[in-house]
Amino acid sequence: MPTAFRRVVLIGKSPSSEVADSLDALGRFLRGEGCEVLAENDSAQADLAVVIGGDGTMLAAARNLVRHKVPVVGINQGRLGFMTDIAQEDMRESIGAILAGRHTTEERTLIDAEIVRDGKTLLTTLALNDAVVNKGAQGRLTEFEVYIDGEFVYRLRSDGVIVATPTGSTAYALSAQGPILHPSLPAFTLVPLNPHTLTARPVSVSDRSTIEIVLRHSGDARAHFDGQALADLAEGDRLRLKRSSDPIRFIHPPGYSYFVMLREKLRWSEAVERN
């Protein structure tokens, strides 16, 4: 079958036998379609990455693959599966359609994050969902200042703050009463976590902005990135966030709809049935 995706890497992090079985079955299917199936260590040479698992597996894979400009498609064998939108039972049919050119491509923004202490960079990383400043092990409120493009925005005492991409707006930020941002929106949203005030509300800004969060009077705080990378923060530390220069490309099968995913996965705007 002629296809733009000649070399395909399969990624599955879960130790479950079900994921292993799916990896094996999909590998056989791809070889039958004339594709070369690459080992995960060779993913930089792939034309397409197929991720089997849940959203956590997809987050890790996307951050690793984005610098190689390898598009990704997800097969859900996790819990929610908001980013891994192909059901396991539809795996062969959907991947076959994608190989035949029947698919849509969607670019998703990542956050480029940097932690600076005393003028020196401590950590740089990427996040597809969100960067979160949160209280540490002692459970005390954090106090921090937020700057947008160098302009002071607010100072807040709270459990922390979430800075989410449109992709991450349906994750942790949603649980904290943040807005849903469509993936095509060039925006970030800042969502306070349990603020010690009656007036703090989420705010969305252009993703061309540089966001800085500066720790004040907070001796016990942490920064989390996609819930997978972690760094301890000290008073005076600066967390600098901006849009990554490279987006990740998601491949979707025929019939994919973001709003259908919202309804099916999150029960978005579902009417309450009366008996």
Regions found by a protein language model. Give the residues of each.
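Short glycine-rich anion-binding loops that position phosphate/pyrophosphate groups of nucleotides
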Residues: P15, D55-T57, G78-L80, T167-S169
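Gly/Ser/Thr-rich active-site loops/lids in small-molecule metabolic enzymes
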Residues: R155-T199
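Proline-centered loop/turn at the N-terminus of a beta-strand
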Residues: K69-P71, T189
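Short, well-ordered beta-strand core segments
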Residues: A49, V72, V161-I162
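A residue-level signal for conserved active-site and pocket-lining positions in enzyme catalytic cores
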Residues: K13, V50, N76, A131, ...
